Structures are given as C-alpha cells and as structure tokens.
Amino acid sequence: LGLEPWGKAAPESTQERALHALHPSRLRWTLLLLAVLLVSGIGATGFTHLMTLYMSEGMDAMRTAAAFSLCGLALMAGKCVCGALCDKLGSYRANYLLFGSFILGCTLCVLAPLKSEALMLASAVFLGFGGSLITVGVSIWAGDLSTPERYEKTLRLFQGAYGLGGIVLSFLPGAIADLAGGYA
C-alpha cells in the first residue's frame, strides 16, 4: 500500500525531488484549475443527460432507465477499482485507461440516433466506469501534482475548482440542446 514504518525516514523519491524543485507559475496553476473546472462540468452534470439523450431519440423509457442504472453501477465499480488501478499501474496510466473508457462512452453516445440498445448499454458502462476518475480523481491529481507539504492546499484548490465547475457548467447541456434543437 505504500505505507512506511513509523519513525523511519524514507528517502525522497524522484517525483518528490522534482516537485520540490518545480515552482509552477501562476499561469500553469490557473490552467490546471481551469482543467479541473472543465472536467467537473462533465462529471458533475454530464451523467444526468444520458437518459434524456436516449429518450429524445425514441428509445423506450424503461430500457433507458435501466441503462442509466447500469451507468450508476459501473460508476460505483469504477470508484472501487480506481484506487487499485492507480496503485498498480500508476496514476498516469490509470488516467489514460479511465479517461479512455469515458471517451469511448461519449463516442458511443454520438451513435444514439442508431437506436441500438446494445450501444446504449455499452455507452452507459463505459461512461460510468470511466467517469469514476472524474469523481475521485481530484485527490489523486492533487497528490501527484503537489508535495506532501502542499497537498492539503492543492486539494482544497482542486476541490474548489471542481465544485465551481459543477455549479457554473451545469446549465450547458440543456443550453446546447436548446441551441442545437435537441440532445442528439
């Protein structure tokens, strides 16, 4: 698990040395917080529009609700697996894997006009599983992008940006649907 015995000084890792030497500019921190804000816009509100998308395409409401429930189950499973993946593969590779799953789910949502139940279920699973990183990844990113001394401050900044993004960007899917004439 990466735990160290109490009282034994562990040698500083390469990552910690690099982070101690690195003093990101305000521009880099601003861009990083903007990225967290945008990610939260997807993670905090994006899932709620999955049902609306498929129902607006004429899919059965009960089957769409089942797909949404499946998305929730995949999200819970992904949250349980996310930490283990980060420990086993490293957070860098786990980010690629989980975001790849999320992007695949989004890509399958684009195929909603085909009215395929299999594609709807697959999109729900990939969105849910990949979306786990969007919801629990903030603390992982804060740990990777800060030193132990700065972790709490970095996490607080990231969580603030995440919360702000969820509030500020929550209207976007509906506004885009209004402008585009529908969700699909």
Give the residues covered by each predicted segment.
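Paired intracellular helix-loop junctions of major facilitator superfamily
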Residues: 142-152, 181
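Small-residue-rich transmembrane alpha-helices and their cytosolic helix-loop interfaces
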Residues: 68, 72, 99, 155-163
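Membrane-interface helix caps of multi-pass secondary transporters
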Residues: 49-58, 141-145, 175-176
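C-terminal transmembrane helical hairpin of 12-TM major facilitator-type secondary transporters
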Residues: 63, 69-75, 79, 86-141
